[in-house]
């Protein structure tokens, strides 16, 4: 084992985050919480951030509708720097179980299942996810 691997083991796994649609939308729509999300969005990359494909859909749609195509494409460009996680049948089954267990909607269940699958902390202001242990809730 090389020195880097030993150091990595002592420190434990690197913290992975998942920025919920709420955070991306706040940031790119210049919402009231944009500054709170800025450190996460601006440092997001494939090494430290996972993004469910359904989040790409939600963010692109809402930003395009509110701010236009150029701003929506900027949001997509930033999200595409992260590790985009496709919805597989296994992830869909896990999301369905989460939906049943916590009475969450489809998108929130997919986000939570993705976070669990990648051992990621969810960064959000979504009230539906606030009670989940892996959530860092940014208050309004």
Protein language model features and the residues they cover:
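Histidine- and aromatic-rich ligand-binding microenvironments
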Residues: 19-20, 51-53, 104-105, 126, ...
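Short, hinge-like loop/turn segments at secondary-structure boundaries
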Residues: 66-70, 102, 138-140
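Active-site neighborhoods of divalent-metal-dependent phosphate/nucleic-acid chemistry enzymes
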Residues: 84-125
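Short glycine/serine- and small hydrophobic-enriched flexible loop segments
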Residues: 61-64, 116
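Amphipathic alpha-helical segments within well-ordered protein domains
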Residues: 57-60, 96
